[in-house]
């Protein structure tokens, strides 16, 4: 299963990182950083669906998505055409991402940045904050309840927000017992990589939406998808593949932003 391969490779990465990382020094450096940008606030526009536009070069299921990939240019196009926040894939082995993409985008963009990776260990959170992440993705399906709680609380402690991702009812119920206020519903089953927007509709039935900011992730490609998700009360959408594979990326961003309600009369 691809997910098990990803976890195994990520744990090896973490082992290598821990051999060289000075965690005490990392913690000290974090105390010197300015406050992170408010990722959740950037998404919340009453009655609208905000776009988290993703910097995505490749995927395990489809390979290289964007042959002429330029992370800085993508970030500029996304921001100048109405994205509310940016997601930066930093996994190298399966998504051809780099942590340096996040660091470099932080220097040029004023939008909140989400580090999208497979976070399994506290050292990755320290690394993320120092690289410029304002929020990180925590995938409930990859973590035990204890691990999720530990990482979630550490995010808060070091001034980052966590977008906590769920795909099943069981995962959602587990996350709802935490203090998570930013929940991502992944329409992609990570064991099969199949997508279905009905996943968001199904899981939303269990959420008191007034208290929680909901992001729908994966399988979102057309303005009709945005309008459907808007009708459910979703606050944000995370879109990557549909943007980086578009013939006219700026136009595609505008299409999604307008469908979400921003730019409409």
Curated annotation (Swiss-Prot):
Family: Belongs to the TrpC family.
Keyword Amino-acid biosynthesis appears in the UniProt entry: yes
Documented EC number(s): 4.1.1.48
Listed HAMAP family: IGPS_B
Highest rank taxon of the organism: Bacteria
Species of origin: Desulforamulus reducens (strain ATCC BAA-1160 / DSM 100696 / MI-1) (Desulfotomaculum reducens)
UniProt entry keywords in alphabetical sequence: Amino-acid biosynthesis, Aromatic amino acid biosynthesis, Decarboxylase, Lyase, Tryptophan biosynthesis
Pfam families in UniProt: IGPS (PF00218)
Functional pathway: Amino-acid biosynthesis; L-tryptophan biosynthesis; L-tryptophan from chorismate: step 4/5
InterPro entries in the cross-refs: Aldolase_TIM, Indole-3-glycerol_P_synth, Indole-3-glycerol_P_synth_dom, Indole-3-GlycerolPSynthase_CS, RibuloseP-bd_barrel
Protein name: Indole-3-glycerol phosphate synthase
Gene: trpC
PROSITE patterns: IGPS
Catalytic activity: 1-(2-carboxyphenylamino)-1-deoxy-D-ribulose 5-phosphate + H(+) = (1S,2R)-1-C-(indol-3-yl)glycerol 3-phosphate + CO2 + H2O
Disulfide bridge partners, by residue number: none
GO MF: indole-3-glycerol-phosphate synthase activity; phosphoribosylanthranilate isomerase activity
GO biological process, one term: L-tryptophan biosynthetic process
Signal peptide feature range: none
